[in-house]
Swiss-Prot record:
Subunit record text: Forms oligomers.
Keywords: Cytoplasm, DNA-binding, Repeat, Transcription, Transcription regulation
Any single GO CC term annotated in Swiss-Prot or TrEMBL for this entry: nucleoid
Protein name according to UniProt: Transcriptional regulator MraZ
PANTHER family: TRANSCRIPTIONAL REGULATOR MRAZ
Family (UniProt): Belongs to the MraZ family.
UniProt cross-references to Gene3D superfamilies, sorted A to Z: Transcriptional regulator MraZ domain (3.40.1550.20)
SUPFAM superfamilies assigned: AbrB/MazE/MraZ-like (SSF89447)
Protein's organism: Dehalococcoides mccartyi (strain ATCC BAA-2100 / JCM 16839 / KCTC 5957 / BAV1)
Keyword Nucleotidyltransferase: no
Boundaries of every SpoVT-AbrB domain copy: 5-48, 77-120
Location in or out of the cell: Cytoplasm, Nucleoid
Length: 142
């Protein structure tokens, strides 16, 4: 399980370290993919990515919508590994997609991580926090 918010700066090669506590969970590699509907990068441990892929196979969504979802997730995904110092290099297409400049935020989101440009994250975090309580209240009503 991933949680917490971590701030980093990209080095001249577009790398940044991941928190030491989460590195063991990523020893088999991770998959980076564009956030669906959000300007961030999803980072899934390989085992979680495989679970996601399997769950999508059994979804009852219309075939045309499923093809679009598969394209959005899988065609733009990258299989990456941390280097010996625990650093992650962001692929250029994903950096561009998420608008990542120098400062990045890594946010733990249960079974995966999200990588955001710091400025974009600040506005998203505020919106998420405002809506979270409304969502919790709705869940409590049911």
């Amino acid at each position: 399980m991933f949680f917490g918010e971590f701030e980093y700066k990209l080095d001249e090669k577009g790398r940044f370290p991941l928190p030491p506590a989460i590195r063991p969970s990523l020893k088999d590699g991770l998959i980076l993919a564009p956030g669906t509907g959000e300007k961030c990068i999803y980072a899934y441990p390989l085992c979680e990515w495989k679970k996601l892929a399997e769950s999508l196979k059994s979804t009852t969504v219309a075939p045309s919508k499923m093809r679009r979802l598969n394209r959005a997730l899988f065609a733009l995904a990258f299989d990456v590994n941390l280097d010996a110092q625990g650093r992650l290099t962001l692929p250029a297409p994903l950096k561009t997609y998420a608008g990542v400049n120098i400062e990045v935020i890594v946010a733990g989101v249960n079974n995966y991580l999200e990588i955001w440009d710091k400025e974009t994250w600040e506005s998203e975090k505020k919106a998420s926090q405002e809506q979270a309580w409304q969502i919790i209240e709705t869940l409590e009503e049911h």
